[in-house]
Structures are given as C-alpha cells and as structure tokens.
Amino acid sequence: MPGENLSRDEARERAALLSVDAYEVSLDVRSAVGEDTGDGPRTFRSVTTIRFRCNEPGASSFADLLAPSVTAVSLNGRDLDPSEVFDGSRILLEDLAADNELVVDAQCAYSRTGEGLHRFVDPEDGEVYLYTQYEPADSRRVFANFEQPDLKAPFRFEVRAPEDWTVWSNGVGERIEKVREALPQKGGGGRRAGGVWRFAETKPISTYITCVVAGPYHQVTDSYERVFEDGTRLEIPLGALCRKGLAKHFDAEDVFLVTKQGLDFFHDHFDYPYPFGKYDQAFVPEYNLGAMENPGMVTFREEYIFRGKVTQASYEARANVILHEMAHMWFGDLVTMEWWDDLWLKESFADFMGSFSLVGATRFTDGWITFANRRKAWAYRADQLPSTHPVTADIRDLQDAKLNFDGITYAKGASVLKQLVAYVGQDAFLEGARRYFKRHAYGNTRLGDLLAVLEETSGRDMGAWARSWLQTAGVNSLTPQVVLGADGRIEELAVVQEAAESYPELRPHRVAVGLYQRSQVGALERYARAETDVAGARTVVSELAGADAPDLVLVNDDDLTYCKIRFDETSLATLREHLGGLTDPLARALCWSALWNLTRDALLPARDFVGLVLRFAGRESDIGVLQMLHAWAESALVHYAAPQWRETGGRALAEGALAELRQAEPGSEHQLAWARFFATAASAPDDLELLKGLLDGTEEIAGLEVDQELRWAFLEPLAAHGVADEKVLAAELARDDTASGKRHQVRCLAARPSAAVKAGAWEQVVDSDALSNALVEATIAGFGQASQRELLAPYTPRYFEAIERVWTERSIQIGMDVVRGLFPALQDSPETLEATDAWLAAHEGAAPALRRLVLEARDDLARALRGQACDAAAGTSAG
C-alpha cells in the first residue's frame, strides 16, 4: 500500500465511498510519567471505535494510523491480523458492509517534535505536560481515523491520566472515577493509579481540529454571557491554561478581555452564535505554530506569556492571534474546506478577521498599520518566490499541504479579502459570510460555495474577480506618473501597473491615490485624495487633474489593495529627505514597506535603506513599525549590503542604535526596542563591554530595566563574539533554570565562535534526533551567526550531502526546520548558488516539498546577490 503521504486523489476516492457517523477514542496516558525504559519510543495506549457507512458494500478502503505497533483490529466483529492489515501508516479495510464498525487497539508514540501528542518535561520542577497538535494530518499519530478534512464526524473522547492531572478536550469534560489497573503499554509495568476523564460529544468536526491537553496545568476560569435580540441567552465557560512555572507571569485577565471583546464582535457581525460550548485557551510548551483553532480548546505557543517587559506590539500580536483563532470557530471549524486546495477559505479569512476585529473591538486601533507593515511583507516575499502559487492552490498531497501554510495562504489571502471588502462593500461581504455559515454549517466547501453567496449579496460577478485575485499568482507594481502643466498644477496623473513576466496578470485594483505636500513647519501632509479603479497597464486618475503639484504621490494610500508601491522620482527624492515628516502613521508605514521592497528588488541600495533607518526611525511613533524597521535594517546589512561595506554599515547601525537608546524616554517601550536592536548590532569591543556592564550592574542607562529576557538578549552577542563562555552561560541558566532559560542557553551555546562548537551543534541537529523541536530550533538559531561566515563555510557541502537523508528519516516539521534553517545563506557567493543548482539538477526525483524548500532558499540567495551588486555599484559611484 502507499505510504503516509495521502494524495488528493486518494482522499477524494475515499470521501466518495465513505461517510463517518461517529468516533469514540480512548487514550491511556498514565505512561507519560515515570522513568523511561530507553527501549524504543515511550508509548501510550489508544483504542478507537469508528462507525461509518460505505455506499458500495464489498469495496475496500483504508484507515490512517502512524504508530509503533497495533495490538488488535476488529472490523464488524471480525478480528483481523494486525501484521497483515497494518503497514505502519494505513490499516487495510476489505469487504466493507453498508454499515461498519472498526475497532483499533494501538500503541502510539509520544512526540518530541510537536506533532501528534507532544510530551514535555519541565526542567524547573520535573512536571510532565501533554498536548496535541495535528494540522494538517497528525491526529493519526494519536488515534486511528480517516485523516482528511471532509470526513467530519462527532467525537467522544475518554482519557485515563495520572491521578493528580487535569485533562481537557474539545467538549466539556468531567472526571468520573479513579482507576488502578495494569498498564499494557511500554514503560508502564505494574499498576498505577489514575483518573478517567470523559468528554461530551462534539459537533461534527474534522480530525485535525480534535484536541487533548493533559497535565498539572495552572488554570484560570471566567465566563462570557450574551443576550441576543430575540431574548435567547448564551453562556460560554472560559478557561486559560499554562504551565505552573509560568503562572506568576500569566496575565489571564487580558487574555479574557480580548476573548470577550472578540466574541462580542463576531456575534455582532456573524449572526451565528458560537457553536462549540466552552472556550478554553491553553498556552503550551515547545509549540511549533503560533496557535491552533481546535474548537473549544485553542492551543497557543507559551511565548505569548511574557516573562519580561515587552512592547505594546507584543500584546497587539497576541490579541491578533487570539482573534484569528476565534474567527476560525466559524471560518474553518463550523465550515471547513473540502481539501487543502481551499485552505485559504479558513486561513485567509481568519487572518483578515484578526485585524478587522482587532481594530473594531479592542484597544489596538492601529492594527491595520501592523497589517500593512508586517503581514504584507510576509506576503510580498512569498509571492515572489519560485514556489508562489494562487491563493487557491494546487495541493497534491499532505506534504504540499504542510508547506502551504505560508505567506500566500495567510497574508496575501487576507490582503485580497481586504481588497474584496473595498470591491463589494463591507455590508455585502459580511452578509455573504452570514449566509455562508447558515448554508454550510458543519459541512465542507469549495471556492464556488463562497463566491455564490457573495454574488447574491453584492450583485457583482465574482467569477472574473476570483480568476484575477484567487486563481493567479504574483504581485503587481503600481507606479504614479505625474505630468505638470505650465501653471505648475497637475495636468495628468496616471497609475502604471506592471507584472512579472512569469505571472503577467494585470488585476483590477480599487485604490486610493494620495497627494502630499510639505508644510511651512516641515510636516508632510495629505492635501488631496481620490479613490479609483485601476485596470490594465495604465489608468488616468482624472479626479486629481488640476490639483497643486505634489511633493509625494502615494499610490494605494490607506492600503486598500495588495500591490508593491513604487514612486516617481520627485516622490522618492522627497522621502529621502523628509520621510520623518509624514504625519500619518499608516502612510508612513506604507512608505517604509515600499522602500524595503525596493531594497529587496535591488532598486534601492542597501546602504541607502540603512541610512534612512538611521535618519528617520528615531521619529517613528508606532512601536510595531519601529521594530520591523530594526529587523529590516539588520537584514539589509546581513544579506543585501556589499560585503566590503558591511563593517562600515554595522558600525553605523550600532552607533545609531546606541544614540537612540540613550535619547529614548527612560522606561519607555521605544527605549526597550532600541536596547534590543543595539544588542543585535553590537560587535565593537566598547559595545560589548557596555552590554557586559549592563548585565553585571557596572553600567546603567536611566530607565532601562535589564530583566531576565533582556539579559539573554544581551548574552547572545556576547557569546557570538567570544566574550561569554560556557561557564558564563551555565551561571545564567542557574539564575533562570526554566524551560525558557534552557532554550536561551542552548541558542547562546551554539552561537559561540568555535569550530568545535559548530561541529557539536551540527551533530545534535543533523545527525541525531535527541533534541526536542524547541531545542532544534534554538540550536539552529544560534548556529548561523552573520559574524561567523568563515567559520560556517565548511558546512555548505555538508548541508547538500545531508538534507535528503534528513528529509527521509525525520518528521516533516524537523525536516523543514533543518532544510530552511541550515541553508548556507551566509555563504552568499556565486559558488553557493552553483552548489545549490548542482544539487537541484542531481536530485530531480527528490520529494517535491524538499525541492520547494531548496528552491525558495536559492531564490533568497540570488536576490541577496543582486542586492549586493546594486549596493556595490552605489558605493562605486559615490566613491
């Protein structure tokens, strides 16, 4: 039988044959505690009963299961030989009846990669914590099932757990009895006490959004109440969970505040009451994603619990994620895409709704600025990679699906929806959503199902819009052309639209064009605006004819559409001198984003972008934009600056960051942001001595509190430059002997400038699977230091020798982390590009998902080399 990589064709064939009525899943996780035998993987018992129908009696199919062993299989009362029907990933089901009952008793393995049932041991107190993460297809690591989104069914879960644990799942649960019985699974000899938790049956949901969380979690509770216009009353129990070690940092009251604001907002706009009973939110350790929308039991990465001082941008990001996952309760959980081709039907909508509700319901009213500056940057990058794809993608199999949780599916899709709202109007858009929920509740949909309701509510032909925006790839560029008359006023203003040769689609854009002039006090302010439809290669904006000559023309003012903004020569010259004078924060964010795209496209030298950041970032009021500028400036220096200018640019960034740090308001979030940026830029002896002094208390900057998280941020550059050794890092871990502290220490250890250190880090990640997913991530992050290019050079050939083996032997999550994280991007030379091309030519038969990752990394490298050539040319001309 085929392996574990389920194809779309297989899924469609199975969905045409089977209908699932119910699941009953019984898990025994008492083996999670106690000593590990060390003999094979630690396992737990999983017993699954599936009741399903087959519309072709006598036909054959299969169930999915990834497990070390299967104890028993029964189909319609017939005992099957597991060795004959189970191949490690599938259970063969032959001679099916019209109505069927399948019972599978298996030994499933706990995970250390964040896929399936993840087991985490807290180094602080030795407590064990479990949680599940499945998307797109890892529930089969925990129980036997039909692992595809369109075979929905109600689920009943029962979990046996250690006596002092609490267990949560999608439905409301209760502990019904204590048990003391033999543990049949590996590592569970003898008898062990426990408790049995049973959970209410769920509504029909897909396998990938079922969930179990178990352990001695700290829990805070609250409730949400809503009385609707017809008098009906809805009460939703709320819960918020984290590890006991994080309880002292857990601001559950703010989590609940945003949760209630979101529930109010979505009830106001969706006209469909929250359908899944309770609403728990668990912040869990070693999580691969930002969060996951399991109905009734949302899981988040625990880094959203802040151990030290952070800026408001961090609180805004957390609120956005809370609302994003909440939007999924309707877009994704209530109504689910039929197959991963239409992943956008949940992720694009949730991404859009996250910002839409953030601005409409919470204190974060500038959420669209963050969207324009941060989310769209992700989309623009993804849409220019060789792996770009339409928002509605061609997903052949599960490996394709895993990689398509990308900037196209999330941020471009959300940007397209923002354009759709401008195109059809907000009222028509929301009424379409309401009809969509009511028409397809607990079902599965395709693109056409959504377009149908939008055509009904807007009266517009959605087919042409969908073809341009959802079924083609690539990003358009919009550039203003200004012709002035003899009187100095605008005679004609046009918008020129361009597309890449590989994706030539010129789309219809609803845009606002803003005209800006400098005032007598130096402010750069908008004095005219026109909203228009751009179509084809050139569109005249007749509404602006006769306006005063502008200093700046901003195409896509207010960020209505998805495009790369370009500037005419006058506008670009104005920004070079007066960017800090732009008074509107959204306009300023859009200009910064456009300048960054120019840098990435080798149209603006990296040194010019760095210079703009040094000159104007200190005047940036939006903290999220400021932190994004810091990240872009670092990336410009590391990847796009000419090698011969890097040292000069690095000194300039460090000096500028330190000057801004000293000038920032004491105790302000801007001071904190500049402190962190200074640490990333520090390399000179005096800078490193200052960081050391801030750590040991011999130096002080008024108002700057060097808390534990900031201490680790200062230690990484000290470790990377050989100032903080293993002894220093061990002492810091003793000071912060927590799971978070361990991750920081591992990253800093791998950052040290030693050949032996790099060899050890490589062995731990590439040649061993002993590290958990979180420590793999931390090791990779420390390994690749921009100041250590020569030290890392020997790993270029080793990378290409290893990646196919890693992809074959390790889980897809770890494979992705290694292939992306260890690509020799810092060996930015034509020779590395040639080595990449040689690998691709010699491995045409490699897994498509693996080739996609290498092609993406190759494209980033080629783009960096073009940027370096542009920057070098600027340096030559300046000289």
Protein language model features and the residues they cover:
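Long, ordered, helix-rich scaffold segments
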Residues: 487-492, 503-506, 521-525, 542-879
